[in-house]
């Protein structure tokens, strides 16, 4: 698009396409911008060892300090929020998984979609379908178990009731 600014009239967010994508003001904008759209998972914010974690089912995801501060200051500890993660921020490379502060998550690939320079993997996390955009050199195929990790530095958190962004 050649436009410098886009307007999401429904939700009154006026910004550059890049900012709408990277810093959505609410769930609608987050889901509207990008293809495939952002993945949304319910997460309970908890404290563990002085740090905040997002619990998605049995998975505990370490929350980066700046996001943890916003969640804590907003009174979200002990509450369910919506965790948003873009498909390109889910990684199946061993190097990323080993460097992740959270334990790797596991699932089974339901669909493998090769698009040339990228691959989309579709699988479930805690009963919710998730889409990951990964390197085409991935060895994962339909039916394979997969280990993956979220890049929590690029995660988004939304208030479950108001659907407004808590932090990007």
List each language-model region with its residue ranges.
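ABC ATPase "signature
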Residues: 13-15, 23-26
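Residue-level detector of high-confidence beta-strand sites
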Residues: 13-14, 112, 168
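Short acidic-hydrophobic catalytic motif
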Residues: 18-22, 30-33
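Glycine/charge-rich catalytic "coupling/switch" loops of P-loop NTPases
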Residues: 22, 51-108, 129, 139-168
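Structural detector for short beta-strands of small beta-barrel domains
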Residues: 36-48, 101-112
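A residue-level detector for short acidic-glycine micro-motifs
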Residues: 45-47, 89-92, 111-113, 136
């Amino acid at each position: 698009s050649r436009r410098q600014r886009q307007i999401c009239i429904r939700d009154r967010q006026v910004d550059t396409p890049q900012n709408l994508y990277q810093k959505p003001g609410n769930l609608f904008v987050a889901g509207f911008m990008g293809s495939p759209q952002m993945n949304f998972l319910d997460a309970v914010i908890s404290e563990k060892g002085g740090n905040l974690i997002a619990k998605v089912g049995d998975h505990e995801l370490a929350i980066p300090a700046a996001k943890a501060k916003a969640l804590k200051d907003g009174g979200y500890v002990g509450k369910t929020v919506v965790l948003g993660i873009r498909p390109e921020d889910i990684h199946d490379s061993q190097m990323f998984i080993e460097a992740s502060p959270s334990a790797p998550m596991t699932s089974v690939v339901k669909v493998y979609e090769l698009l040339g320079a990228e691959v989309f993997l579709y699988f479930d996390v805690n009963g919710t379908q998730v889409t990951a955009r990964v390197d085409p050199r991935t060895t994962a195929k339909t039916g394979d178990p997969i280990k993956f990790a979220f890049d929590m530095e690029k995660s988004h958190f939304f208030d479950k009731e108001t659907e407004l962004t808590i932090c990007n």
